[in-house]
């Protein structure tokens, strides 16, 4: 009883979280958004089931379908049936396809496993479901899943798939099998290669006419033998003897959720002969086939892989000005999980790049992780009905602006503070962008080095800075005074690499001010263009003023 109460509470919490993210739309706006996406998904369904074609990745289709269902629930509409074919077919299945309930996570699986025993895990092969009917040892009929009760007659197509046994003997001579027709792969690594739109490709091959040769790129994974042997080991042995060897190879006994997680992770990274999108855990003991009905299989569940790419809603478009004055665009997202990382922001790039992407709040974008776990945009998969884009700031900034604070300089000024505090410059541990914003908002810095004047009391009384960290921060600010001259020059934004600056052997501000363009040009990696930039930088009025201020603070190398 406690287990079922826990499951119920989990479901209620999930429902609460789903309601919490309902869009703040008027009824008219909601109707328009739902109607547009519903029509598009219907068109994709028609293409998929009638033509065997798909213009959209399987994973994107699944996530947009889930988004539509969420919107419908939010605004009191009846959710659509998940990808049910427009033409269900006329051939009755001897045994109904039940489908499989998908669990959210390992904890949900653990709760389910407590109520079942003699459990086995299989890969959730990504393809299209089929019924194989054998009578008197021969393949008598092959039926597409359809609506689970009726499907299309695929006998002629399946008879041309060489990997599907056309004759069987022994216990399978008069049997009904259920399985997945899949695209054969050599060494498919799901973690690296993703879904490759396998489901749509298989459907396309099965729907089209006159493609008998390409059918040999398909095979079948049998996952159910209704009314078969009671022992799973006997089932697997008989299937393997009949030619369905993959089922025995990829079915393992499991005792708990940890073992399932281990196998799931192994198959996620291993070379497999098919595309998968998770694992299925099933009890060996099944009801008699006459009790099987679509959507009512309590003896098996699925635990899907997290998609390599996630569809995320754009909540806002924000503009950031870097220390060099370049304007970059960032999309703020409704949170999504990617490889155990919570992603709420993604960098779009320049204003021009943002305009090329044509992204507005309310759009749905496909996000994945690039190298080093950095989120990136792969595609814009759906654009909202009402689209209002913010106006980017005027491009008035450059590498020599905003050393001193002003209202228009807010973002570039903060970027300069973040830069000078970084490890490669002054190495101010324990403070990032949020901390700098808090300090500037409270103490209204005049310029990028004003923090040197803050007292321990001022730091301790700064909202947003924990009192326990204020003393440490003051210590860091004091230590910065001992940093070498070249680090301070880097903090001032000199347009040179650290290697070039070190090679210059400049050790004082006065020496640097008197260095010529020819001197800078002979440094490693510094051409005439960069040398002119250095001259322009050191002759800038703001830079000279900062140099004088640092001299007054007796910073090493700046003293007269």
UniProtKB/Swiss-Prot annotation:
It is an enzyme of class 6 (ligase). GO terms for molecular function: DNA ligase (NAD+) activity. Pfam families: DNA_ligase_aden (PF01653), DNA_ligase_OB (PF03120). Keywords: DNA damage, DNA repair, DNA replication, Ligase, NAD. The active site is at residue 124. InterPro entries: DNA_ligase_AS, DNA_ligase_B, DNA_ligase_CS, DNAligase_adenylation, DNAligase_N, NA-bd_OB-fold, NAD_dep_DNA_ligaseB, NAD_DNA_ligase_OB. It comes from the Bacteria. One of its GO terms (biological process) is DNA repair. SMART domains: LIGANc (SM00532). Its EC number is 6.5.1.2. It catalyses: NAD(+) + (deoxyribonucleotide)n-3'-hydroxyl + 5'-phospho-(deoxyribonucleotide)m = (deoxyribonucleotide)n+m + AMP + beta-nicotinamide D-nucleotide. HAMAP family: DNA_ligase_B. Belongs to the NAD-dependent DNA ligase family. LigB subfamily. Catalyzes the formation of phosphodiester linkages between 5'-phosphoryl and 3'-hydroxyl groups in double-stranded DNA using NAD as a coenzyme and as the energy source for the reaction. This is DNA ligase B. It comes from Escherichia coli O6:K15:H31 (strain 536 / UPEC).
